[in-house]
């Protein structure tokens, strides 16, 4: 497979033909990572890396603007869907729905299956549209209470919570799934359905690892609740208020899941009437949230919850814009070609480029969503040129992005550490187990979507 000698960039009708050096893209990426590690705002770090990479790669100032603008325009579809998902996220987090679901799952399974229940609770909460850091904050107080009674270590509890969250994250209508779907021009529901079995394997691995290490490390106590700074209230604001019943709490997520699955299930079952239902997640997620809110009798709170939801999405949207800019730099260079040559020379099948890109980009940015959008925007065309289907590419890239995405230069590392009152050293000890969980999901995703 050969690449053209130039890259065509179209911005507002202006076409610029330019090819940047691969090393300039790497330097821009390295600069962005370095600035993130130095605690510069992630969006600015990504954009500055893109600008510097373009300039040193041979682009003029005008061409640099075109590259950056073109890159950011490429993620606008994702941005719109993420903002729409904010309505559902606001309702799930602020109304007490997520708290009720978590409590119900843990109470149902009891102490004998406590580790499984905690992992499953985090998985389900993520799967219905709650961000993984918030899901961990919601379940952490319950985990600490149960763990202190059973003398379970902090390590085991966070492995269960983080692993369950990772499993739920790849089958959720969260930004990472939306980014993976948009990057390969498919519906988020297709990614969610195809990621379900890998997610189950991830859940199983999380429970297995947490069970094996439940007596390793410092045992959690009720005093550790203070380390989360009232995490329950912070994550949902419903600690001191009456939670909705489980029946009413399930209305919003149930409607969202059912409507999202109609089209892909129709394709699988060969039912033409179902395949004709092609309503985008941009409509489904806010609709499900509003219906769920009315079912709970909290319709009057819609302005408060939507405001809270979009506030939680703003940071993610800004990061996506920065990632789009950096993606514009990479796609305007011959870096994808160089990586393809390297993979070919090493004898690695080209079909594995999707999960490899997910792993590397997520590690670089310490973010699943940012890793996916960078991987898709930078290597999407190259991946598809190897014959990988869009669904397989999206699913395996997203799974790969869960392997080493929880590094110290990202927000999740510190939020999850605080939820369990862990030191930095203790939190670092969780990383190998998180990587094993993510790797398990990646291998299963590759086997199901690429090998067979």
Residue ranges and their predicted role:
Residues 5, 11-25, 29, 56-57, ...:
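Long, contiguous bundles of hydrophobic transmembrane helices that form the permeation core
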Residues 16, 144-249, 389, 412-448, ...:
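Membrane-core helix-loop-helix motifs of multi-pass transport proteins
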Residues 20-23, 73-78, 105-120, 147-157, ...:
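Membrane-interfacial loop-to-helix junctions in multi-pass transporters
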Residues 38-42, 76-78, 89-99, 126-138, ...:
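Short helix-coil transition sites and intra-membrane helix breaks within transmembrane domains
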Residues 44, 66-99, 116, 123-124, ...:
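Core transmembrane alpha-helical segments of multi-pass membrane transporters/permeases
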Residues 83-84, 108-142, 321-323, 346-386, ...:
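Hydrophobic alpha-helical transmembrane segments of multi-pass integral membrane proteins
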Residues 87, 100-102, 133-146, 174-184, ...:
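Re-entrant/interfacial helical elements at transmembrane boundaries that shape
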Residues 112-125, 150-170, 191-194, 200, ...:
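Alpha-helical transmembrane segments of multi-pass membrane proteins
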């Amino acid at each position: 497979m050969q690449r053209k000698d130039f890259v065509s960039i179209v911005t507002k009708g202006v076409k610029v033909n330019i090819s940047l050096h691969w090393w300039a893209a790497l330097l821009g990426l390295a600069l962005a990572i370095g600035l993130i590690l130095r605690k510069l705002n992630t969006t600015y770090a990504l954009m500055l890396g893109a600008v510097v990479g373009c300039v040193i790669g041979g682009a003029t100032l005008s061409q640099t603007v075109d590259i950056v603008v073109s890159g950011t325009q490429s993620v606008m579809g994702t941005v719109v869907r993420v903002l729409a998902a904010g309505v559902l996220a606001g309702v799930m987090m602020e109304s007490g729905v997520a708290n009720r679901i978590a409590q119900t799952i843990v109470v149902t399974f009891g102490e004998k299956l406590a580790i499984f229940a905690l992992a499953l609770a985090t998985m389900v909460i993520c799967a219905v549209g709650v961000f993984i850091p918030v899901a961990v904050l919601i379940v952490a107080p319950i985990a600490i209470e149960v763990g202190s009674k059973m003398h379970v270590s902090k390590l085991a509890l966070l492995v269960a919570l983080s692993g369950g969250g990772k499993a739920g994250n790849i089958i959720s209508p969260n930004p990472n799934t939306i980014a993976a779907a948009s990057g390969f021009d498919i519906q988020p529901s297709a990614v969610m359905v195809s990621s379900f079995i890998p997610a189950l394997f991830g859940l199983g691995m999380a429970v297995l690892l947490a069970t094996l290490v439940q007596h390793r490390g410092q045992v959690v106590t009720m005093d550790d609740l203070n380390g989360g700074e009232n995490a329950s209230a912070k994550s949902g604001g419903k600690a001191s208020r009456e939670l909705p019943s489980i029946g009413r709490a399930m209305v919003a997520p149930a409607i969202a899941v059912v409507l999202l699955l109609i089209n892909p299930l129709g394709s699988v079952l060969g039912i033409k009437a179902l395949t004709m239902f092609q309503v985008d997640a941009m409509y489904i997620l806010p609709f499900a949230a509003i219906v769920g809110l009315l079912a709970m009798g909290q319709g009057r709170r819609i302005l408060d919850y939507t405001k809270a939801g979009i506030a939680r999405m703003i940071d993610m949207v800004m990061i996506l814009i920065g990632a789009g800019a950096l993606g514009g730099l990479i796609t305007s260079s011959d870096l994808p070609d160089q990586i393809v040559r390297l993979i070919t020379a090493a004898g690695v099948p080209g079909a594995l480029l999707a999960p490899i890109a997910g792993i590397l980009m997520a590690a670089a940015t310490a973010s699943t969503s940012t890793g996916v959008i960078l991987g898709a925007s930078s290597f999407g065309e190259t991946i598809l040129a190897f014959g990988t289907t869009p669904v397989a590419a999206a699913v395996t890239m997203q799974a790969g992005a869960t392997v080493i995405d929880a590094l110290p230069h990202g927000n999740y590392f510190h939020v999850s550490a605080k939820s369990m009152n862990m030191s930095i050293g203790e939190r670092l000890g969780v990383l190998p187990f998180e990587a094993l969980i993510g790797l398990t999901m990646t291998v299963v995703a590759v086997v199901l979507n690429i090998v067979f």
